[in-house]
From Swiss-Prot:
Transport found in the keyword field: yes
Keyword Mitochondrion: no
Pfam families (UniProt xref): Globin (PF00042)
Note: There are at least 12 different components in Midge globin.
Gene name, Swiss-Prot/TrEMBL: CTT-10
Residue numbers binding heme b: H64, H99
Alphabetically ordered keywords of this record: Heme, Iron, Metal-binding, Oxygen transport, Transport
Name of this protein: Globin CTT-X
Amino acid sequence: DPEWHTLDAHEVEQVQATWKAVSHDEVEILYTVFKAHPDIMAKFPKFAGKDLEAIKDTADFAVHASRIIGFFGEYVTLLGSSGNQAAIRTLLHDLGVFHKTRGITKAQFGEFRETMTAYLKGHNKWNADISHSWDDAFDKAFSVIFEVLES
């Protein structure tokens, strides 16, 4: 599995530090993703066809944002230990299965990645080294998720 590797300590530190800076921005992150990619929002039965501006400040939106972005935070937290690799793989596999049943595409995961990276860049000091660390973190996650989507 060429993409499956344990990030080194430096990469983990960078990913976790930059994540920490935005980890409580759940609503804003999900809003940013939906605003940039209405096709992703359309996959959420609770939100499909609704006005994003009207739902952004609702409890339903906050709960969903907390779940989605919280999952991502769990992944980032688990990155720090080689003993967590099986748990990470299981978490990502289950995410892939869930999203496959909802018809989520690799392209939509790519859109999420693009928007999340832009959000992270906008809320952190950013450089090529941090960018590389996040690329590795996304590649690791997507290697498992895409394996499921393609099965």
